[in-house]
Amino acid sequence: MTQGKASAQDVINALNLEPHLEGGYFRRTYQADHRDWLETAAGPRYLMTSIYYLLTEQSPVGQFHFNQSDILHYFHLGDAIEYSLIHADGSLQTVVMGNDVLAGQHLQLHVPGGIWKASRLLDGKNGFGLISEAVSPGFDFADMEMGNRQKLTTAFPQHRALIEQLTRDED
């Protein structure tokens, strides 16, 4: 970045990001065009894809969603981002990605396929948090399910308050 404090809009413009379905902003930066496709139960997929993903004060939540593929997250800059992961057995895991490793924040996070995941920007001085994701097999919208509030609260009633915060009201 140039001298001075970058705003969320500066980062959106510099990286050519666009609004994401789950919240925040993104841009696909890589797909393994030079590799053979992987055959999956849902059809052929790239071996790997990667995106930039940005949460901002104006769009601070990545809504609960479910991916079939494994995803590696890499923190780059800005404010910390809290991830809420609901496993199939109903257990909840909370991980904070950020650059303060001495405070227990993580620079990398692996989320296996088959876990409900949501993220939210934590308060900080920047007004945004930027990560990258590497997805294998490569991301395809057919392999992703957005979290339905009623379905998730029925399946995981012990996490009702969190689910209500991190899903859209479909009514």
Where are these regions (language model features)?
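N-terminal segments that mediate ammonia production and transfer
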Residues: 132-134, 138-142
